[in-house]
Amino acid sequence: MASDLLCCPGGTDRFDHERTGPGPAAVSTEQFVWGRMKSAVPLGAPRD
């Protein structure tokens, strides 16, 4: 599902031709990658 959001510019609804992008509140690819890296830290491990 997350891959659909990253690959499809309009989000998961591929048939909505009026939208041209994910919108102003969407997470950029860089923010998404950093968020995934931080979530991969095991519970109980020290974080930044």
UniProtKB/Swiss-Prot annotation:
Keywords for this protein: Toxin-antitoxin system
Entry keyword Transmembrane: no
Induction record: Part of the phoAT-phoH2 operon.
Annotated S-S bridges: none
Residue stretches in coiled coil: none
Changes seen on gene knockout: Deletion of the phoAT-phoH2 genes has no visible growth phenotype.
Transmembrane segments: none
Function, as annotated: Probable antitoxin component of a type II toxin-antitoxin (TA) system. The probable cognate antitoxin is PhoAT; the toxin gene can be expressed in the absence of the antitoxin gene in M.smegmatis strain mc(2)155.
Similarity comment: family membership: Belongs to the PhoAT antitoxin family.
Record note on quaternary structure: Interacts with toxin PhoH2.
The protein's name in its UniProt record: Probable antitoxin PhoAT
